[in-house]
Amino acid sequence: MSLLRIRKPKTRKGKKVLLAREPQLIESARTMLFLDGRKCGGNVKLCMKDLQALKKPLVKVLNRKNDITPFDDPSSLEFLTMKNDAALFTFGSTSKKRPDNIILGRIFENEVLDMFELGIKRYQAISEFKNEKIGACVKPCLVFNGPKWAQTEELRRLRNLFIDTFQREKVDSIRLQGIEHVLSFTVTDDMNILMRSYRILLKKSGQRTPRIELEEIGPSADFSIRRTKIASEDLYKQARKQPKQLKVGKKKNISTDALGNTKGRVHLGKQQTGSIQTRRVKALRKTPEEKKENRQRKKVALKAAAAEALASQGNNPFSS
């Protein structure tokens, strides 16, 4: 049950705000909501601050402390995400039972879709790395190391959540100098998640392709997976469903060969080649002698037709 009473808009601006919150055919990049629990400090504050820096400008921060327990009762969290029009959220808290705790999750139709509780075992903030940083609003390259990301459904969903979190606007093409940032995620044997952040350096190699070096710029974190809550297969399939308008229809009689060439087959009806108007080339025109012969043939044909008509009238007994 929603805690926010829906009221009909009375102004044009209010209508535009509600229309912007409705599902769009092409969704924009997702905004993340950051909020604190009853007690929050230390590594949790540093981690959330660095995540805000990586996610900017698609962030909304609530500075007040919230008495929320997302895994027990997510209704207050769903209300805040709906009110702030955020599809992603990060909730930070710390307690004696679960120290240095952050919860990452996403929303679908104003309800929690997936939610993962991660414990911070080790953390190095961006400020601890004394080197040059990347610019703002840079789209990072996401690297998921190892086959363990596909072993369980929880890890597959967590990988998908990381992609949703750091994904920005979709682009058709990129330039080589625009690739500046790499975020690496690794699952260890004891099911810990190692997050590393690198800056890409393009060095001269004497060839057309530059030599690439990685410089760690932070944040650097080791997470342990605590509690998880994932959606059912039917709900997850519904959340991933694309509108019919965006689906590419199957094109008939079109195929692609091994070299990537597109070939098409066209079906035509029976053609009347005798009535096709062709270009009259001077070399194909008739000579005066041929024209004279044609006129004589026409005259002979007309005389023969007239004689045949007279003969048929003479043989008719009823003719006067």
Swiss-Prot record:
Gene Ontology BP annotations: cell division; maturation of LSU-rRNA from tricistronic rRNA transcript (SSU-rRNA, 5.8S rRNA, LSU-rRNA); ribosomal large subunit assembly
Superkingdom per UniProt: Eukaryota
Record carries keyword Lipid biosynthesis: no
Keywords: Cell cycle, Cell division, Mitosis, Nucleus
Residue ranges with Low complexity bias: 302-311
UniProt subcellular location: Nucleus, Nucleolus
Molecular-function GO term, any one: rRNA binding
Domain Brix span(s) in chain numbering: 30-234
Stored Pfam families: Brix
Coiled-coil stretches noted in the UniProt entry, renumbered to this chain: none
Principal subcellular localisation of the protein: nucleus
GO CC term, one of those recorded: nucleolus
Record region (Disordered): 268-320
Family: Belongs to the RPF2 family.
Protein function: Required for normal assembly of the mitotic spindle. May be involved in both centrosome-dependent and centrosome-independent spindle assembly programs.
Name listed for the protein in its UniProt record: Ribosome production factor 2 homolog
Native source species: Drosophila melanogaster
High-level lineage: Eukaryota, Metazoa, Ecdysozoa, Arthropoda, Hexapoda
